């Protein structure tokens, strides 16, 4: 994992560099996970274009997009708004089930991965904080690559490290918000992984569930693994 440093976008990270169970490594420059790209300078945007960015998948709802447009929805980038709800957990222990609701949203998830399969160049996918909806997509990509579960958990947990100042401010400004909102505890991703593994025997079974062809699965795996 390598963080892409921007002044305003704190949780933008390349999924490259993770070791896999078969002794390989995930590719740099294929997939970027991110919180909402906003307030970026022309220099920062140009740097992404020079890295090969060609496609942006914005996972936010239409209401979220209208409230805060994605700064990367520009000429030269293929922008897709595939609206997925993050759910509304009432308690922290509800989070893993909310993540399962995301992966079981067959139509939307199939669209996400079909865009990735058909894209040429680097793909950036984002939601608002870049940790829940984005974290679920990142987990699926890393699992497809054969990345160790410990690294999948670490990739999820580090979101809070980069977002903690914004999250603290959110709670100061909204004191009635439940304390768990904004966090990215490893235990929540671990429980989600357990739910996922009990539902699907292997990651290929999940992509079969989505209706992704075997050729499509191979293309996606080849894009993320060296």
Specify the residue positions occupied by each region the protein language model found.
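Ser/Thr-glycine-rich phosphate-binding loops at phosphate-binding pockets of nucleotides
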Residues: 129, 133-134
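Cys-dependent protein tyrosine phosphatase-like superfamily
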Residues: 1-124, 137-226
């Amino acid at each position: 994992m390598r963080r892409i440093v921007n002044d305003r976008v704190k949780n933008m990270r390349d999924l490259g560099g993770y070791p896999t169970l078969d002794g390989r490594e995930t590719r740099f420059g294929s997939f970027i996970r991110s919180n909402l790209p906003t307030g970026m300078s022309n220099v920062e945007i140009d740097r992404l274009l020079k890295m090969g960015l060609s496609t942006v998948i914005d996972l936010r709802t239409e209401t979220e997009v209208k409230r805060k447009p994605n700064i990367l929805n520009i000429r030269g980038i293929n922008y897709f708004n595939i609206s997925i709800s993050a759910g509304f957990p009432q308690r922290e222990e509800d989070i893993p089930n909310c993540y399962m609701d995301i992966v079981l949203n067959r139509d939307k998830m199939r669209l996400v991965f079909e865009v990735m399969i058909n894209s040429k160049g680097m793909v950036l996918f984002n939601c608002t904080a870049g940790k829940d909806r984005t974290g679920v997509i990142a987990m699926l990509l890393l699992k497809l690559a054969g990345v160790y579960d410990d690294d999948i958990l670490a990739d999820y947990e580090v979101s809070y490290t980069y977002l903690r100042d914004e999250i603290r401010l959110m709670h100061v400004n909204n004191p009635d918000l439940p304390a768990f909102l904004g966090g990215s505890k490893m235990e929540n991703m671990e429980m989600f992984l357990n739910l996922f593994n009990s539902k699907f025997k292997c990651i290929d079974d999940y992509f079969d569930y989505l209706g992704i062809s075997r050729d499509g699965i191979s293309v996606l795996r080849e894009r993320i693994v060296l």
